[in-house]
Amino acid sequence: MKKLILTFSLSLFVFSLFSQSSKIVFENSEHDFGEIQEKGGKVSYKFSFKNDGDEPLLILSVKPSCGCTTPNWSKNPIKPGEEGFIIAQYNPRGRPGVFRKSLNVVTNQSIQDKPNNIYIYIKGNVLR
């Protein structure tokens, strides 16, 4: 009987661990800069998101697809219901033409709540 109660208690504990998670929800996952001048210098966009889960959300890393994009993000845990940000800065120097770059956002979000890796995008057209 003790084994049955112990097994049942452990099952409830494990289930409760997996039922709690953080959940990142972006207002939009892509930004179009439109036409930008190469001589105009770097351009930036601030992606806003909300933690729709019931546990704190932590952005572990933001990995750009190339060296032309520099990310900055909320470093502190985002409490449930609160908002955070990721800023994507693009350097158009020496890169004329159409572009579309991704940023891989890695969070502490539960793997069950796929995806753990989220992608956001910036795009535009660099004019000389």
Which residues make up each language-model segment?
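Surface-exposed binding patches on compact interaction domains or structured appendages
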Residues: D54-E83
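Surface-exposed loops/turns
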Residues: E38-K39, P80, R95-P96
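Short, acidic/polar linear motifs in exposed loop/turn regions
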Residues: D52-E55, G94
